[in-house]
């Protein structure tokens, strides 16, 4: 098995060299067993790397003023992932919202990455006993109203269908 997400185009995504082994194993599980697309697996990988960086700073493993982009996400073992608490998860969500300016949908997706990772660690790999994300709900997403055509725009669309195409009657219907 390749260490690249995209075997046909290995330059598209870098090999998994900058994350803990647990994260690498999880992303491979996503691709091979769960059948997720390479892009989905890669996005989860990036989300978990960012969480690793956040946790290193939160636990004092790097200087408090270290830039997130400069923190090495490697070096966190299974025992470390087992020490993460629900409060750590809440603090991460707050960080994403306040410091990173993530929208609710982005925060929800990053939380889904963590949910999936801990589900894998507890239920599939049997490496951990507790899931700190189990009782954490995603942020409530704003409802987006559908965009609709005005009566005039709908009429224009129908008129256009009568003058274009090989089957104007069908297109009009």
Task: Describe these PLM feature segments.
Residues 1-173:
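Conserved catalytic core of the tyrosine transesterase superfamily
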């Amino acid at each position: 098995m390749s260490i690249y997400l995209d075997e046909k185009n290995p330059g598209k995504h870098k090999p998994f060299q900058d994350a803990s082994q647990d994260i690498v194993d999880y992303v491979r599980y996503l691709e091979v067993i769960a059948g997720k697309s390479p892009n989905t697996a890669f996005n989860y990988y990036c989300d978990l790397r960012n969480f690793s960086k956040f946790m290193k700073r939160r636990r004092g493993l790097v200087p408090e003023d270290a830039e997130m982009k400069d923190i090495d996400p490697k070096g966190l073992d299974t025992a470390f992932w087992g020490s993460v608490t629900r409060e750590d998860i809440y603090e991460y969500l707050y960080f994403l919202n306040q410091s990173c300016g993530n929208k609710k949908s982005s925060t929800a997706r990053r939380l889904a990455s963590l949910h999936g990772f801990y589900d894998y660690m507890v239920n599939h790999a049997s490496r951990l006993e507790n899931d700190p994300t189990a009782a954490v709900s995603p942020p409530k997403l704003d409802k987006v109203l559908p965009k609709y055509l005005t009566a005039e725009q709908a009429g224009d669309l129908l008129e256009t269908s009568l003058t274009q195409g090989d089957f104007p009657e069908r297109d009009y219907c």
